[in-house]
């Protein structure tokens, strides 16, 4: 597998490893919106690490180089 595919697989399995995948609430767990926000923040940090400083967020979980970001903004 390629590195990017491995990272995506890891991201898909991460909620299961954290215990958020079974859907059962346990006293003291974070509420779902807070957990989702934390997971999205983690994904954005990971994307920035992969793409480096050229990263411009151009969609949900999508990181584009600056020249692609300008094209994306023009069509949205």
From Swiss-Prot:
The keyword DNA repair does not apply. Keywords: Cleavage on pair of basic residues, Disulfide bond, Secreted, Signal, Toxin. Disulfide bonds join 55-64, 58-63. Belongs to the conotoxin Q superfamily. GO terms for cellular component: extracellular region. The keyword Ligase does not apply. GO terms for molecular function: toxin activity. Residues 20-48, 73-76 form a propeptide. This is Conotoxin Fla16d.
